[in-house]
Amino acid sequence: MRVKDYKPHIDGLRALAVLPVIFFHAGFEIFQGGFIGVDIFFVISGYLITNIILKDLKKNTFKISNFYIRRARRILPALFLVTLSSLIISIFLMSEEEIKFFSRQAISVVLFISNFFFWNNTGYFNPNSELQPLLHTWSLSVEEQFYIFFPLFLIFIWKFFRGKLNYFLILIICFSLILCQMGGNFKLS
C-alpha cells in the first residue's frame, strides 16, 4: 500500500480478523468459526485494491502490467520459497505415492488454483486436511484469482459504463451473497 494512502484503522481490522483465525487453528473450541477472519481479510483486500485501481483510473495512470508486477513481487518470492522447501522436505518424509499427490498440490499452488484442488480432493474441514502442508494456500489462490480477474473487470466497466460503476459493484456484492447462500445449501467444504 502506498504510504500516503495508509489507513491505520484498516490495520486495526486486520489485527481483529487475525485473532479468531489463530485461535481457530490453535484448536480453541470457542473459535470454531474463526475462519470468518479470512473472509474479513478478503473484504479488506478487495476494498484496498479497488480503491487503488479506481484512483489510478481516475488519474488515467493505471497500467495493468504494473499492477500485476507489484502483486507478483509481493507474493511470489515467499510462495515459491514455501512451495519449493515443502517439496524438498516431502522427499524425506513422504512415501512415493504421497509425494505424487503432494506434487499435484504444489502445481496447483503455483497455478493459483489450490482452492479448487483442495475442494475437489480433501476438503478444508476433513480430519485428514491437517496432513496437507500446503492447505493454507487455498486463500492465497482465491486472492490471486481476484487480483488477476477483478482489475480486468474494473477496466471494462470504467471504459464502457463509467457512470454506472457503483451499480456494477452492488451487483457483484449481491451475486457474491447469492453464491455464498448456494454454497451453504450445497454443503461445500
Q: What are the residue ranges of the model-derived segments?
A:
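Membrane-interface helix/loop caps of multi-pass membrane proteins
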Residues: 1-189
